[in-house]
Amino acid sequence: MAGNSIGQFFRVTTFGESHGLALGCIVDGVPPGIAITEADLQVDLDRRRPGTSRYTTQRREPDQVRILSGVFEGVTTGTSIGLLIENTDQRSQDYSAIKDVFRPGHADYTYEQKYGIRDYRGGGRSSARETAMRVAAGAIAKKYLLDKYGIRVRACLTQMGNIHCQLKDWELVEQNPFFSPDETKLEQLDALMRELKKAGDSIGAKVTVVAENVPAGLGEPVFDRLDADIAHALMSINAVKGVEIGDGFGVINLRGSENRDEITARGFTSNHAGGILGGISSSQPIVAHIALKPTSSIMVPGKTINRQGEEVEMVTRGRHDPCVGIRAVPIAEAMMAIVLMDHLLRQRAQCADVESSLPRW
């Protein structure tokens, strides 16, 4: 199966299935001399980990990461870093009843059409369980970006259903189970999740990811534009159906006089572009938003077909998230960090000697 890798200079390749023995990834391109421990990676893995609150799937995976290679005495050696997480709480029997039935809204039907075979246990390779390795690799990138360049990558839940959360307080994000930055909406989010669990249904969400202190100049012309690569990375996250950079689709309602980010001697006057102009970072905060669909793994009966093409009605049993947007927050951070680290290394390789007389804010 192709398509298991992302990045050029900083390259991440993942492997493993939801109910397989383990998940793993190979991280190439990490410069030598970076202090990295398993504990550094575990912080973000614990934020994504299932079974940590009543609002997410009750599959209880410790997601303990092991560093297999590329780190010696707590420091990267410049060689490939191998990471592994063992699966310990698989309940494959939950899926035996659907091995010959295609769950509506899932990848069952398309995987079967493409490969002629599929791992029906929790979706196999198409499961969001795969993203644990992205988060582990992204933690390496986040640490490098922050320690080396002062770049901070953060994300939060800014919408669940029709509940809109204002980006008011980054510190609050880590203090509630929704990763919400808006304290005034916590009770509404709790009530909605209780309602969904009682109904056996799910809801969509919006996650906002912001990278601050990104230097100007990252990104390549035309096909490797920074915003194109960010959109590609974020769109590859399970359940993501839309990506916006900056004001995104909101620019449709703006005039050119409103949308352009004017420049003064003190810097930009606005950031409608989301920190990227012409596919290259402008030094403003990079802002992206992702829309995540409501999971199709719900207790509400739905129509589908079996292998024989016969119409059947099914209920998806198992342990699932009423809102996948909650655990998508650390995943979005990881994918943004992976892209930024890749482009920083590419910029250093090609343009390290470039000196500009333009001001940098």
UniProtKB/Swiss-Prot annotation:
Cofactor: FMNH2
GO biological process: amino acid biosynthetic process; aromatic amino acid family biosynthetic process; chorismate biosynthetic process
Pathway in which the depicted protein is active: Metabolic intermediate biosynthesis; chorismate biosynthesis; chorismate from D-erythrose 4-phosphate and phosphoenolpyruvate: step 7/7
GO MF annotation list: chorismate synthase activity; FMN binding
GO cellular component, one term: cytosol
Listed Pfam families: Chorismate_synt
Binding, NADP(+): 48, 54
Cofactor: how bound: Reduced FMN (FMNH(2)).
Purpose: This reaction introduces a second double bond into the aromatic ring system.
Family according to the record: Belongs to the chorismate synthase family.
Name of protein: Chorismate synthase
